[in-house]
């Protein structure tokens, strides 16, 4: 989260308000090309049915692209996992647990039907659904889950989990820019993984 904050804070005075690496990444898809930041909210919580913990994105950003808005859930990684696989997340739940209702809501938002989710990391489902939910709330016509990875080789296990999630969503995981999923979500959903360098002193200074 620190690296993410530095990257975005250091870009706030730029013309587009987006970190250069992110801007370059977004420019590789027609639905996000030329994005400019409208608002960015760190640790935004998004409600879903079922109670329990809300979906808290590391950063939620609303971007403007020509004549439309894009809702972006940004998840930072630096060696940590995407929470538990769904199978483990559901293990030993009580009869009164809201988790089944929460998972059903995520399935509906992401148009997953009865697809097997046992080995899918729960956080990836939650954050991508949050991007779609916030798109609905703010009238955005596109949603994006963006993973900004700062951990280098330490993030390889998470990259593998992201690839498994992309397979679930019927899209590629190795694109150099955002990829549109094959699921028929209420607004087009894009996903993307971006490897980023750690902050250096000039970047830290710009963020202060």
Functional labels for PLM-detected ranges:
Residues 54, 68-71:
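Short, mixed charged/polar active-site loops
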Residues 123-208:
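Non-catalytic C-terminal interaction segments of nucleic acid-processing enzymes
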Residues 82-145:
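Acidic, metal/cofactor-coordinating or nucleic-acid-engaging core segments within structured domains
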Residues 51-55, 123-126:
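Short, glycine/acidic-rich beta->alpha junctions
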Residues 59-61, 70-78:
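Conserved catalytic cores of phosphodiester-cleaving nucleases, focusing on short active-site segments
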Residues 55-61, 130:
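Short alpha-helical segments and helix-capping/turn motifs at coil-helix boundaries
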Residues 1-52, 64-65:
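Acidic-basic catalytic patches of nuclease active cores, encompassing PD-(D/E)XK
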Residues 68, 80-85, 136, 153-157:
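Short catalytic/ligand-binding loop motif for oxyanion handling, primarily in non-cytosolic enzymes
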């Amino acid at each position: 989260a620190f690296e993410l904050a530095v990257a975005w804070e250091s870009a706030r005075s730029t013309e587009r308000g987006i970190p250069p690496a992110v801007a370059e990444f977004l420019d590789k898809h027609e639905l996000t090309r030329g994005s400019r930041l409208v608002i960015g909210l760190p640790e935004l919580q998004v409600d879903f049915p079922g109670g329990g913990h809300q979906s808290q994105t590391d950063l939620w950003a609303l971007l403007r692209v020509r004549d439309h808005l894009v809702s972006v859930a940004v998840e930072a990684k630096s060696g940590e996992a995407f929470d538990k696989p769904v199978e483990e997340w559901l293990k030993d739940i009580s009869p009164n647990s809201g988790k089944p209702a929460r998972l059903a809501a995520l399935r509906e938002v992401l148009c997953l039907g009865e697809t097997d989710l046992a080995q899918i990391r729960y956080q990836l489902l939650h954050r991508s659904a949050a991007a779609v939910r916030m798109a609905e709330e703010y009238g955005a016509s596109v949603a994006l889950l963006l993973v900004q990875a700062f951990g280098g080789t330490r993030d390889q296990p998470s990259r593998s989990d992201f690839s498994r999630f992309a397979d679930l969503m019927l899209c590629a995981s190795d694109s150099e820019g955002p990829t549109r999923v094959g699921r028929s979500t209420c607004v087009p959903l894009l996903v993307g993984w971006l490897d980023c360098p750690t902050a250096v002193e000039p970047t830290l200074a710009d963020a202060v």
